[in-house]
Amino acid sequence: MAALRPLVKPKIVKKRTKKFIRHQSDRYVKIKRNWRKPRGIDNRVRRRFKGQILMPNIGYGSNKKTKHMLPSGFRKFLVHNVKELEVLLMCNKSYCAEIAHNVSSKNRKAIVERAAQLAIRVTNPNARLRSEENE
């Protein structure tokens, strides 16, 4: 079967590709890079002084048409069993299935087989599948 392609694949434009880093995380090891909003009364970043690191705000949001879209052009839908896969039957050109991390390898095989029958793309079909020579 040929590779499943989305119905439309618009160009995904990100307004910012760099991560927003936490104020003074480059100075101290104990301060992690994960973003935290500065709340100090004298904080330069919170007051948006020129030359300081940028704060995330609504203006950096993605286009509504391409929000949550994968580079392949599909949107992800988390699947835990074969029954949940049936939901994607009518919208298999815009959504792809992603098998949840806590699904057993036996159920994964069943989900991947059923997805092939329904022409639904699976983002992680080879996860946790052992090859025959290892068994």
UniProtKB/Swiss-Prot annotation:
Disulfide bonds: none annotated. PROSITE patterns: RIBOSOMAL_L32E. GO terms for cellular component: cytoplasm; cytosol; cytosolic large ribosomal subunit; postsynapse; presynapse; ribosome; synapse. The modification N6-succinyllysine is found at residue 50. The modification Phosphoserine is found at residue 62. The keyword Phosphoprotein applies. GO terms for molecular function: structural constituent of ribosome. GO terms for biological process: cellular response to dexamethasone stimulus; cytoplasmic translation; liver regeneration; translation; translation at postsynapse; translation at presynapse. Keywords: Cytoplasm, Isopeptide bond, Phosphoprotein, Ribonucleoprotein, Ribosomal protein, Ubl conjugation. It holds the Pfam family Ribosomal_L32e. It is found in: Cytoplasm. There is a cross-link at residue 9 (Glycyl lysine isopeptide (Lys-Gly) (interchain with G-Cter in SUMO2)). Component of the large ribosomal subunit. Component of the large ribosomal subunit. The ribosome is a large ribonucleoprotein complex responsible for the synthesis of proteins in the cell. Belongs to the eukaryotic ribosomal protein eL32 family. This is Large ribosomal subunit protein eL32. It comes from Mus musculus. The gene is Rpl32.
